[in-house]
Amino acid sequence: MRCCHICKLPGRVMGIRVLRLSLVVILVLLLVAGALTALLPSVKEDKMLMLRREIKSQGKSTMDSFTLIMQTYNRTDLLLKLLNHYQAVPNLHKVIVVWNNIGEKAPDELWNSLGPHPIPVIFKQQTANRMRNRLQVFPELETNAVLMVDDDTLISTPDLVFAFSVWQQFPDQIVGFVPRKHVSTSSGIYSYGSFEMQAPGSGNGDQYSMVLIGASFFNSKYLELFQRQPAAVHALIDDTQNCDDIAMNFIIAKHIGKTSGIFVKPVNMDNLEKETNSGYSGMWHRAEHALQRSYCINKLVNIYDSMPLRYSNIMISQFGFPYANYKRKI
């Protein structure tokens, strides 16, 4: 019995040696793998973010996302605040900033230094300060939907998410938050008017015939359609530095043969103009603003030889009110 017990010892010793050898081999392989990994080029955080963004965007159709276009002039502080706010909006694919500060470098380096950012922001330096610069066919535009926002307007994320869902149901119309109307007179001259929500019980509410593009969604195909308009339309906008939004309503109404836009009642939309340090005020403050826009309406009627704008009283709200029946001006 003692002899048999002694005979089993060499086998156990051999097993221990094999185990030790295996551990040594595994350790060497791990060290080699670590060394090879160290030799590989490092992947920066911003590159990884870009890669994840590309993979994410590839999984979405062009109807599931939109591009924000924002034209700006002399409001860098406010611009950075707005860009930071809109970064968190779901379904936002890209931001295009139309930089109208001629002779001044766009703040792309400053913006990038505050990153990384989940949504890419592209600054488009312009050679002339024109109102219609924002209506170019940008090669970076890859989505069907455009969200156009003025550089002093902050729209809440819930409002944008809801309005985008409405636009997906009506992709041939402007879907936005600021309605306006044209008013005809007995002399046949048109004037530009605001939109007043009326008190309940006073009818189905006021009517609008335009939805301003400075806080709206619309189809990117209309940017190309705008470029094909008569030269007189472009000249009117350049001469007045105004009315590109009125022209877009004319163009779309004429193209689709119905009301150009759908009014979505905003819950939380603010004008931040007073928060900028530049001291620059929007053109709507000018005394001649309303007269100039009335002039544009009549001029466009002459150019197109018709009045394509049509009235609507439909208001779509997150809270289910079907008509514009609240007494206040928008």
Curated annotation (Swiss-Prot):
Its EC number is 2.4.1.223. It catalyses: 3-O-(beta-D-GlcA-(1->3)-beta-D-Gal-(1->3)-beta-D-Gal-(1->4)-beta-D-Xyl)-L-seryl-[protein] + UDP-N-acetyl-alpha-D-glucosamine = 3-O-(alpha-D-GlcNAc-(1->4)-beta-D-GlcA-(1->3)-beta-D-Gal-(1->3)-beta-D-Gal-(1->4)-beta-D-Xyl)-L-seryl-[protein] + UDP + H(+). GO terms for molecular function: alpha-1,4-N-acetylgalactosaminyltransferase activity; glucuronyl-galactosyl-proteoglycan 4-alpha-N-acetylglucosaminyltransferase activity; glucuronylgalactosylproteoglycan 4-beta-N-acetylgalactosaminyltransferase activity; glycosaminoglycan binding; manganese ion binding. Keywords: Disulfide bond, Endoplasmic reticulum, Glycoprotein, Glycosyltransferase, Manganese, Membrane, Metal-binding, Secreted, Signal-anchor, Transferase, Transmembrane, Transmembrane helix. Its cofactor is Mn(2+). Disulfide bonds join 243-296. The chain crosses the membrane at residues 23-43. Pathway: Glycan metabolism; heparan sulfate biosynthesis. The active site is at residue 245. UDP-N-acetyl-alpha-D-glucosamine binds at residues 71, 75, 100, 129, 134, 150-152, 244-245, 293. Mn(2+) binds at residue 152. It comes from the Eukaryota. One of its GO terms (biological process) is UDP-N-acetylgalactosamine metabolic process. It is an enzyme of class 2 (transferase). InterPro entries: Glycosyltrans_GT2/GT47, GT64_dom, Nucleotide-diphossugar_trans. The record marks 53-54 as: Cleavage. Ubiquitous. Glycans are attached at residue 74. One of its GO terms (cellular component) is extracellular region. UDP-N-acetyl-alpha-D-galactosamine binds at residues 71, 75, 100, 129, 134, 150-152, 244, 293. This is Exostosin-like 2. It comes from Homo sapiens.
